[in-house]
């Protein structure tokens, strides 16, 4: 859920990035519009990718694309075609992640039942919701602290170099760090390979 809340927090920080780094706060609507359209369209192709490559690999692909998209935006220099490319890449990445994340959560419920004999949908879903809220809370707190340390002044005509750096840290580098952590965690996720056998065993028990 940390990955999901990191993605959510990115949207909160976009206004700072668009206004002070890209130089036009109105770019937020363009960035979000392209991102959302691509993400929605991408959802229609995820089932096909999951069938061929598995949930873990598609989710990991989404994280990699999110990282690439953030880096492309970071080095866009406000050049609109590159910003569009970044939004497309991140839209595809979020489609991969959003479509597979909850499916993997559902798989862990089946795994828990197979391992312990108890099916705990409520507990698992509550834990996910709690983790999402905690992640959002931490992200919002970090945003305020880092901007304050960087000397960000909301109504300033121009921000200092340290303030601009703090915005980049919040909008680009912290989400990238979370995505990298997600990739590391996925290295230890092997349920895709075992899941058919687990479902067959559960069916046999019932």
Language-model regions, residue ranges each:
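A membrane-interface helix-boundary motif in multi-pass transporters
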Residues: 145-177
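Hydrophobic core of transmembrane alpha-helices in multi-pass small-molecule transporters
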Residues: 81-98
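Helix-to-loop junctions at the C-terminal end of transmembrane segments
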Residues: 42-55
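Residue-level signature of mid-helix packing/kink "hotspots" within the transmembrane helices
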Residues: 36-40, 44, 137
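Intrinsic disorder in cytosolic terminal tails and internal cytosolic loops
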Residues: 189-206
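C-terminal ends and interior cores of transmembrane alpha-helices
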Residues: 65-78
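Short amphipathic helix-loop junctions that connect adjacent transmembrane helices
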Residues: 12-27
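Single conserved hydrophobic/aromatic residue that forms the stacking wall/gate
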Residues: 1-7, 11
């Amino acid at each position: 859920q940390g990955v999901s809340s990191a993605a959510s927090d990115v949207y909160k920080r976009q206004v700072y990035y668009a206004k002070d780094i890209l130089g036009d706060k109105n770019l937020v609507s363009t960035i979000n519009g392209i991102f959302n359209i691509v993400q929605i369209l991408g959802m229609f192709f995820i089932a096909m990718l999951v069938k061929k490559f598995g949930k873990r690999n598609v989710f990991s692909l989404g994280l990699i694309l999110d990282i690439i998209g953030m880096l492309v935006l970071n080095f866009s220099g406000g050049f609109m075609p590159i910003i569009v490319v970044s939004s497309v890449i991140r839209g595809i990445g979020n489609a991969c992640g959003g479509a597979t994340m909850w499916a993997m959560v559902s798989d862990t419920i089946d795994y828990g039942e197979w391992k312990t004999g108890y099916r705990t949908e409520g507990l698992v879903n509550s834990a996910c919701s709690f983790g999402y809220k905690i992640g959002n809370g931490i992200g919002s707190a970090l945003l305020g602290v880092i901007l304050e340390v960087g000397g960000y002044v909301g109504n300033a005509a121009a921000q200092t170099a340290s303030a601009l750096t703090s915005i980049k840290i919040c909008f680009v580098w912290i989400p990238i760090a979370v995505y990298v952590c997600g990739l590391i965690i996925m290295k230890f996720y092997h349920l895709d390979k075992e899941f058919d056998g687990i479902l067959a065993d559960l069916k046999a028990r019932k």
